[in-house]
């Protein structure tokens, strides 16, 4: 029984997901429906958490919009997510960067990973 579930989940998973880690700056393009129109909307920010669960994987992106912190959780293999592009690699030592929620301005900066 579990082999059938694994096979179905494997078929639904996206193959073109780039590798990214917490601390990386990514641009996620998401399909948005407004009335009858469907368009792409970009959300660019720092990845503060990744949850690896196969088909149910998700990641959290945080950005500052008009001086207000905005976080959004994306399902990695969702059909709503059109593309994920890594803009900048960040050098961090933790898997979850929730401490960035309390930091503002220069204190919230992340060093760039050079490799």
Swiss-Prot record:
Q: What HAMAP family does the record tag this protein with?
A: Ribosomal_bL19
Q: Does the keyword Lyase apply?
A: no
What is the organism field in this record?
A: Salmonella typhimurium (strain LT2 / SGSC1412 / ATCC 700720)
Please give the Gene Ontology molecular function terms for this protein. Answer: structural constituent of ribosome
Family, according to the entry, reads as follows: Belongs to the bacterial ribosomal protein bL19 family.
Transmembrane domains' residue ranges: none
Kindly state one GO CC term assigned in the UniProt record: cytosolic large ribosomal subunit
**Source organism, top-level taxon:** Bacteria
The answer to whether the entry has keyword Ribonucleoprotein is: yes
Q: Which UniProt keywords apply?
A: Ribonucleoprotein, Ribosomal protein
Q: What is the lineage of its organism?
A: Bacteria, Pseudomonadati, Pseudomonadota, Gammaproteobacteria, Enterobacterales
Q: Which Gene3D superfamilies match?
A: 2.30.30.790
Name of the protein in its database record: Large ribosomal subunit protein bL19
> What biological-process terms (Gene Ontology) are attached?
translation
């Amino acid at each position: 029984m579990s082999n059938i579930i694994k096979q179905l989940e494997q078929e639904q998973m996206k193959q073109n997901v780039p590798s990214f880690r917490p601390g990386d700056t990514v641009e996620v393009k998401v399909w948005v429906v407004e009335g009858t129109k469907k368009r792409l909307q970009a959300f660019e920010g720092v990845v503060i958490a990744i949850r690896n669960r196969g088909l149910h994987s998700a990641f959290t992106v945080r950005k500052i919009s008009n001086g207000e912190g905005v976080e959004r959780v994306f399902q990695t293999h969702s059909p709503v997510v059109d593309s994920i592009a890594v803009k900048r690699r960040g050098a961090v030592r933790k898997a979850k960067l929730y401490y960035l929620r309390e930091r503002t301005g220069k204190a919230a900066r992340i060093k760039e990973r050079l490799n």
